[in-house]
Amino acid sequence: MRKYRLSEEQRAFSYQEDGTKKNVLLRQIIAISDFNDVIAGTAGGWIDRETVLAQEGNCWIYDQNAIAFGGAVISGNTRITGTSVLWGEVYATDNVWIDNSEISQGAYISDSVTIHDSLVYGQCRIFGHALIDQHSMIVAAQGLTPDHQLLLQIYDRARVSASRIVHQAQIYGDAVVRYAFIEHRAEVFDFASIEGNEENNVWLCDCAKVYGHAQVKAGIEEDAIPTIHYSSQVAEYAIVEGNCVLKHHVLVGGNAVVRGGPILLDEHVVIQGESRITGAVIIENHVELTDHAVVEAFDGDTVHVRGPKVINGEERITRTPLAGLL
């Protein structure tokens, strides 16, 4: 059963693809039967051909300023609202809701995903009950890492707000990401929280992972930008906050708190237990901090700890050990 027809009137639309200006002719969809919340005679958005919007299901392009073309496919019960633009082999199906957003170049969106006021570009998979909003930018790109086939994915109940997720990053589980820049093959999952702000984003790159109930938070001071590099991980109930840089093979786990700054952790550093690091601290080269150990720098001082070394029990370091200077 057909639910809409295309208008006789045509409308030209210009767009850029790979730096080349292109044009497409669009025709407006007009409902010819009542279905869901759409009444016969209602005019909707504009498409370039009937294959864009399925005649089956309750899918509909509600706003007369919304457009879909260039191999886009909208099916199931998908709702397209606001001034959305879908083009370039995009698939939106099941119970997806796309509002005031641009989706292009191979994105596949399914299940009960909601996308508000955001951009999704490139071959990626967004599914489950994921939510993307607050002017987020999802820009997928393959071929920049050794894992050429990996697709950028956001799924389960993950929420991404006011963030840039690029390359082949993975956001899933019940993860919450706000004001962050996550790139390459970095992952955020489980109940992890990435919390930047309007002043400073959190930056995850390379193969960094944040998971468990871990929290990574930016501060509002200048340079209070947590940066997780390479294969470093923040896990369990750990908190990393402020001007902190985790570089090569760093693990912060347990109930540890790392609060900069600036703090630099590098080369096989493990922070776990109930341990705490605050102030201007550098820890590098096979150092383990565990139990209730504390490394704390006071105003104007920098504490530098070099390994190999284990700091545990109730040990407290507030100035650079002599061995740390070697």
From Swiss-Prot:
Gene: ydcK
InterPro entries tied to this protein: B_solenoid_ydck_rpt (IPR040831), GlmU-like (IPR050065), Trimer_LpxA-like_sf (IPR011004), YdcK-like (IPR048014)
Disulphide-bridged cysteine pairs: none
Keywords: Acyltransferase, Repeat, Transferase
GO molecular function annotation: acyltransferase activity; nucleotidyltransferase activity
Family: Belongs to the transferase hexapeptide repeat family.
UniProt protein name: Uncharacterized acetyltransferase YdcK
Gene3D superfamilies membership: Hexapeptide repeat proteins
EC number per UniProt: 2.3.1.-
Pfam family name, one: B_solenoid_ydck
Enzyme class, broadest EC rank: transferase
